[in-house]
Amino acid sequence: MVQADYHSGLVDAIREEGHTRTFGEGEKAVTVRLAEAFGFCYGVDRAVDYAYETRTQFPDKRIFLVGEIIHNPHVNQRMREMGIEFLYPAAGKHGIDRFDFSGLTEDDVVILPAFGVTLQDFERLKQTGAVLVDTTCGSVLVVWKRVEQYARDGYTALIHGKYYHEETEATASQASKYPNGKYVVVLDMDEARLVMDYIEGKPGALSREAFVEHFRDKASPDFDPDRDLARIGVANQTTMLSSESLAIADEVGKSLARRFGSQAGFDIDEHFRSFDTICSATQERQDAVKEMMASEEGPPDIMVVIGGYNSSNTNHLAVLCAKHTITYHVSDAACIDPESGTIRFKPNGTPFNTPETTAEDWLPEGPISIGLTAGASTPNNKIGAAIELILTARGLTSELPAGEPVAA
C-alpha cells in the first residue's frame, strides 16, 4: 500500500540514468538533476508503514495520531483519508497538559509520531489504557539516550534545536527521568553564544534575570544558570544543520575550558561531553546537496526543494541550496502552476509559518538545468509530480517508455 501510494516511475527512471536526464532539445531543453539522496528516509518510511499496518490490524477501532506522523501535508492528508484522527496540542500551549487525552479509552489505538512524544505525554497516554503504536525514529531514540545519560551523570543537556519542535520537546523531556536533570535549548550559534558569554562572565553578557527570561520556554523548570552551566553535554535535534551542531559543540567545549581551565586538576571531561547525534539520513541529504553544488557541472540554474514548510530538515536543505543558486522551497508539487507560469514558495530561512510568496516567469528562456531535492518526509510521487509540472511549463513531457507509470 505504501509503495502504491508514494511511488514514482519518473523518479526511478532518472535515478537509473545517474540522477540526471535531459528532456527536450535546443532552446527548450530542461536538464533535471536529482540529488544523490533525497525524500523518504528509513525512519519516515517505517513510521508511515506502521500507520498503514495499524489501520489494517484495527479496521474497526478508533485510531488517533498524536500531532502529525511526519511533517508532510500530503502524507498527513492520506492518514485522514484512512480515518485516522489527529490530536493537536492547544494553540501556543506548552507543558504536560498541552494535549487533551481525556476522550481516549482502552478501546482506542494511538499512534505516536516519528518525532516521539514527551515523557510526560507518554505516561498520560499509558494511563488511558489505549493500545499505543510507537513509531519513534531510531535516530531520535539515540539522542534521547544521550540526554538521559547526561541527566544521570549531572550534566545539563544543551540541545541545538527548535524548542517548539515536537522532536526537541520530546528529547528535552528525557532529562526529567532524573530529579536534577536539566536542559537548555539553543536555536543557533548566536543563541549558543548567549550561553557561553554567561558561562565566562563576559562584558555585555545577559544578567541572571535576563538569561532566565530569555530562556524561559527553552530551559527546564527552575533552571538556574549560575548552578546549571558548569557541566554541559551537547545534543541536537536530528534534523538541524550538522555543520552548525558540530560548531556549537566545539565552541561550548572551548568556553568551558576558558572558564574552568585555570582550576587545579582541571579535566575537560568533568565539565563537557559531546556526541554527534545528527541522523545519518539528514547528513546524507545535506551532503548530497553540497556535492551537487560542488560538482564539475556546477550548481543547477534553479533548485527546487520539496517538503513541508514546518519540516526542519527541508528548511535546512533550502538554506544550503540558496547559498549557491536560486532556490524555491515548495510544500507540494501543486505549488508549480504551468498555466500561469508561477511558483508559490516559502522564502528561505524564514519561520515555518511565513506566508507563501509567488514568483512569476520563474523559468528563464533557453536551455536550463533544474536541481531537485526533498526533505526526509517527502514521498517520491510528489517529486515526480513536480518534475512533470516543470516540464509541462516548458511544453515538454517526461517521455517515459510505454507502460512505465508516473505516479502524481
Where are these regions (language model features)?
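The feature marks the mature, well-folded catalytic cores of soluble enzymes
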Residues: M1-A408
